[in-house]
Amino acid sequence: MSEEIKKDDLQEEVEATETEETVEEVIEEIPEKSELELANERADEFENKYLRAHAEMQNIQRRSSEERQQLQRYRSQDLAKAILPSLDNLERALAVEGLTDDVKKGLEMTRDSLIQALKEEGVEEVEVDSFDHNFHMAVQTLPADDEHPADSIAEVFQKGYKLHERLLRPAMVVVYN
């Protein structure tokens, strides 16, 4: 019996040793795989970070370019807003009766040269065909009738202007309602 116990103990030791060796081999293989997997994961992570940083840089450059174009396009906005009251005064002066022909001609030439300079910068007069709340400000309303349909403009108190598609000043109008 003691021989059997010894054999069993010996066999258990051999099995335990084999199991330990197998476990050690598996453990040794796992760290190698894990290190490779970790390296691949880190490489993927760095690649993703690089791609995101590159895309962000391209977006910044695109936005910067668009902002420069917008600034260039609307660079004369403040100057145009400052000139519009002078243009209004010229219009009022031309509306005065009793001006000599020479004075009237001089005022018209000055007005026309200002309008031309503003047009070259992209400033346009707002159209007053029919009322549009985006471009017109109703300062008074009149009742609509058969001759004057609703939302038609009766009178323009002050002209409106826009720079390209951006409104500088709405036209102040009387509207049939």
From Swiss-Prot:
Family matches, as CDD domains: GrpE
Q: What is its main location?
A: cytoplasm
SUPFAM superfamilies noted in UniProt:
Coiled-coil domain of nucleotide exchange factor GrpE (SSF58014), Head domain of nucleotide exchange factor GrpE (SSF51064)
The alphabetized UniProt keywords are: Chaperone, Cytoplasm, Stress response
- Renumbered to this chain, region (Disordered) spans 1-26
Database matches in InterPro entries: GrpE, GrpE_coiled_coil, GrpE_head
Query: Subunit composition?
Result: Homodimer.
Question: In UniProt terms, what function does this protein have?
Answer: Participates actively in the response to hyperosmotic and heat shock by preventing the aggregation of stress-denatured proteins, in association with DnaK and GrpE. It is the nucleotide exchange factor for DnaK and may function as a thermosensor. Unfolded proteins bind initially to DnaJ; upon interaction with the DnaJ-bound protein, DnaK hydrolyzes its bound ATP, resulting in the formation of a stable complex. GrpE releases ADP from DnaK; ATP binding to DnaK triggers the release of the substrate protein, thus completing the reaction cycle.
* UniProt name for this protein: Protein GrpE
Give me the gene this protein comes from: grpE
